């Protein structure tokens, strides 16, 4: 990871869940001949962002072996949930790269954001997230102040109970896509067909 680029937000992709309801790893869903995780990495790299992927030990090898332009690390306790996974990534960045940085958090199962939304998040300094029709979505930009709050919290506490992002309205038609079922996977494929300009 390039320290010089840490003036830009660092992206943390959360991909440590076991996808029990879907029955297959969300990161390894195949989209146009590539894993979903690779599609998201490519999308973020277009903005010249550094990327850190947090995953579990079972998915580490397939993700690490197939994903370029990103660092991959293991969350040893993925059962603690997303906040715990995020803490693993934030501590890794603080310990190895910078004590003061912003980060864009991208859950693997919420890929329906546009390039315009990423550009907007990059331009902001306070903790912020997109919304569509008044409902909040992902990714979330975390300020350095809120990163400290998250690191001090218990790992099983939902992020919404720790921070309060400022929201901005976007036109992302698939912002609220949440990959959890086979029907959601069909919507994901529709998204990649209809919004090719975002990839």
Predicted regions, residues:
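Short, well-ordered alpha-helical scaffold segment located
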Residues: 112, 146-149, 184
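Nucleotide and nucleotide-moiety/phosphate-recognizing core
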Residues: 3-106, 111-130, 136, 167-172
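Short, surface-exposed amphipathic charged segments that create phosphate/polyanion-binding patches used
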Residues: 87-90, 144, 183-187
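Conserved alpha/beta core of the MobA/IspD/sugar-nucleotide pyrophosphorylase nucleotidyltransferase superfamily
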Residues: 2-9, 152-199
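Short aromatic/basic micro-patch
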Residues: 112, 141, 178-179
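Residues that scaffold the ATP/ADP-binding catalytic core of kinase and kinase-like folds
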Residues: 21, 116, 149-150, 188
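Flexible, gly/pro- and Lys/Arg-enriched active-site loops
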Residues: 119-162
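Glycine- and other small-residue-rich loops at beta-strand/loop junctions that grip anionic moieties
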Residues: 106, 139, 177
């Amino acid at each position: 990871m390039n320290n010089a680029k840490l003036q830009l937000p660092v992206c943390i992709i959360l991909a440590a869940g076991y996808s029990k309801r879907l029955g297959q790893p969300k990161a390894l869903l195949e989209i146009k001949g590539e894993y979903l995780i690779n599609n998201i990495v490519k999308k973020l790299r277009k903005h010249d962002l550094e990327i850190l992927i947090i995953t579990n030990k079972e998915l580490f090898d397939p993700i690490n072996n197939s994903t370029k332009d990103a660092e991959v690390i293991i969350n040893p306790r993925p059962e603690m949930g997303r906040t715990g996974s995020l803490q693993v990534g934030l501590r890794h960045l603080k310990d190895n790269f910078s004590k003061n940085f912003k980060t864009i958090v991208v859950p693997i199962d919420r890929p329906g954001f546009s390039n315009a939304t990423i550009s907007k998040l990059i331009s902001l300094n306070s903790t912020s997230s997109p919304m569509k029709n008044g409902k909040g979505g992902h990714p979330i930009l975390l300020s350095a102040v809120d990163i400290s709050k998250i690191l001090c919290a218990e790992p099983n506490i939902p992020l919404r109970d720790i921070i309060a992002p400022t929201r901005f309205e976007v036109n992302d038609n698939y912002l609220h896509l949440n990959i959890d079922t086979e029907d959601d996977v069909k919507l994901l494929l529709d998204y990649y067909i209809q919004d090719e300009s975002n990839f």
